Amino acid sequence: LLLTSTADVLRLVTSSAADIQVHASWVDNAAGTITPARQNTIISTATTTTVVPSPGASTQRNVKGLYVTNNSTGTSCTVAVTHFDGTNTVELMQFVL
């Protein structure tokens, strides 16, 4: 999944107050210089959360992995993965954890 503008982000929309844990990993390409990175995010409320931030100017971000788990005991949560380009939000997938 490519994020190619400074407005592109990946977000998670969670439906309930569950213990949602997210790991994202990516590589940035800035004029041929490749830089790996990652981010861990803990979500504990029903909210919209950016889990992969936008790349810098003149940089393309290639998201290599997005791992989402529900560590709650007994609380299910509907999770939507969305791409926001600064104007439009597109739902990429939705599932119940």
Where are these regions (language model features)?
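Surface-exposed, low-hydrophobicity beta-strand/loop segments enriched in small/polar/acidic residues
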Residues: L1-L97
